[in-house]
Swiss-Prot record:
Residue span(s) of domain HPt: 40-147
Recorded GO MF terms: histidine phosphotransfer kinase activity; protein histidine kinase binding
Name of the protein: Histidine-containing phosphotransfer protein 3
Entry's localization field: Cytoplasm, Cytosol; Nucleus
Gene Ontology cellular-component terms listed: cytoplasm; cytosol; nucleus; plastid
Keyword Cytoplasm: yes
Residues that bear Phosphohistidine: 82
Organ and tissue specificity: Strongly expressed in roots. Detected also in flowers, leaves, siliques and stems.
Pfam families linked: Hpt (PF01627)
Repeat in keyword set: no
Record function comment: Functions as a two-component phosphorelay mediators between cytokinin sensor histidine kinases and response regulator (B-type ARRs). Plays an important role in propagating cytokinin signal transduction through the multistep His-to-Asp phosphorelay.
Amino acid sequence: MDTLIAQLQRRFCDFTISLYHQGFLDDQFTELKKLQDECSPDFVAEVVTLFFEDCEKLISNMARALDQTGNVDFKLVGSSVHQLKGSSSSVGAKRVKGLCVTLKECCDSQNYEGCVRCLQQVDIEYKTLKAKLQDLFNLEQQIVQAGGRIPQVDI
């Protein structure tokens, strides 16, 4: 059993490090993890779940606004992307945040094609991050279920 726990912990560490090195996460995610303790062991998963729910709504709102060909409300899109950028920043979603900056620039210049293209990229990155973090949380659960402790990962 100790071997299994050690293997899971190693996978967890390697996977976590890869998320940072590939630019999916930044230091804000590390800060968020520091707020999690034994009294609230699911804190990060809960915050991230709320973030992803927020992402879905905001992306959907922006897609609807951009679907109004010839009558796009760039102010609405800009407001939504500003919210998404803030949420992304608060959970350490580095790639999503970076794409939001580009999308906001497209909104500010009323570049319709740029907005559509960037929104598609935001949607892809959000879905990719969601899948990767779900894998990370699943690894955490496996470690705990096997009787182990979640290792501290130094980035």
